[in-house]
Amino acid sequence: PGDRGFGITATGTKARRDLHGYSTVAVDPNVIPLGTKLYVEGYGYAIAEDTGGAVRGNIIDLYFEPGSNEFKRWFTHNTTVYILK
């Protein structure tokens, strides 16, 4: 949190959880290109804006606001992800 780049994605946007719009997710850009819009069952609409060290293959990383307890039910979770056109 003290890092100036904290919360800034690989695409240069600020990471966000938007319950009424598109939230940030991290993806493997070799599988899902950055900028791709997605629908994640149980999470909502998202846009692939970031990457991560543990995000490989069909693994994605959902963004949650710091201090939110929402992540607890998603810590390790399998769900369906739809790529939107």
Language model: regions and residue ranges:
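Solvent-exposed, well-ordered loop and adjacent helix/strand elements within mature globular domains
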Residues: 1-85
